Amino acid sequence: VADLRAHGHEVTNIDQVGERGSGYVRVDTTDYGQVVDALFGVQDLHDGFDAIVHLAAIPAPAILSDVATFHNNMLTSFNVFQAARRAGIRKIVYASSETVLGLPFDVPPPYIPVDEEYPAQPNSTYSLVKHLEEQMAIELCRWDPELQVTALRFSNVMDVDDYEEFPGYDDDALARKWNLWGYIDGRDGAQAVRKALEHDAPGFDRFIVANADTVMSRSSAELAAEVFPGVEVTKELGEHETLLSIDKARRILGYEPEHTWRDHAPATTGDDPVAGHPS
């Protein structure tokens, strides 16, 4: 919200949780009636919205039961997508997840770096919902050729306060193997949302959103060879280059990570903290 407002967008935050005041409206997104009413206009003086950023969800597996996670997240996304269509809103950006890529990679990925080109491999109820949301968006865009839905497959979201823990990950390469040692700084995640909103291309598309580097001080090539020795590495990797490919987001959305945990944590080994990150 702060990033969008800082870049000149007028934003209304519709959620069950928030601080009272201008720009926030409390809505239960599992209630379709509340959602569609809000999207037509929060009050008589407000005539609706140009676009929607849908981030409301139980944010990870194992926070609630599988059934509660499925019911909440699937219903919320259907309500938002359907209400947007009814309200004539033709641009939706929403949070999908890296989990559809096959996390925790107990079965190795088909290749490294992983990208958006291979079929989803959900391995939890949470990631199953994310996959079903993408499939729902594909069909809604087929029904309505003017609709634009962008799924951002966010990596593990981190804030600056989290970075002091990162050097400890080097003690065990397997500790963060579950998402190929990836992360996304919340500020760069906000940038990706903004770039997706400002991109015009009707239809459905999906993008991995991660930072340019890994959470590790060890080289990406060394990690891949040690933990996934039989998996094809499809390119020459930069020293700490992410194994969650962000090439598509860079190419199409103009997304470019501006932050790295290495600027906030004790000094680590390696001369190039974000190799693979264009200057």
Predicted regions and their residues:
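Flexible, glycine-rich beta-alpha linker
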Residues: 102, 125, 142-167
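Rossmann-fold cofactor-recognition segment
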Residues: 16-34
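Catalytic helix-loop patch of NAD(P)-dependent Rossmann-fold dehydrogenases
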Residues: 71, 107-145
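Conserved Rossmann-fold NAD(P)-dependent oxidoreductase catalytic core, especially the SDR/UDP-sugar
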Residues: 79-123
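C-terminal substrate-binding subdomain of Rossmann-fold SDR/epimerase-dehydratase oxidoreductases
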Residues: 187-279
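NAD(P)H-binding glycine-rich loop region in Rossmannoid oxidoreductase-like domains
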Residues: 29-72
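Glycine-rich NAD(P)-binding loop of the Rossmann-fold in SDR/ketoreductase-type enzymes
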Residues: 27-30, 51, 68-76, 120, ...
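Alpha-helical substrate-binding/gating segment
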Residues: 157-174, 179-206
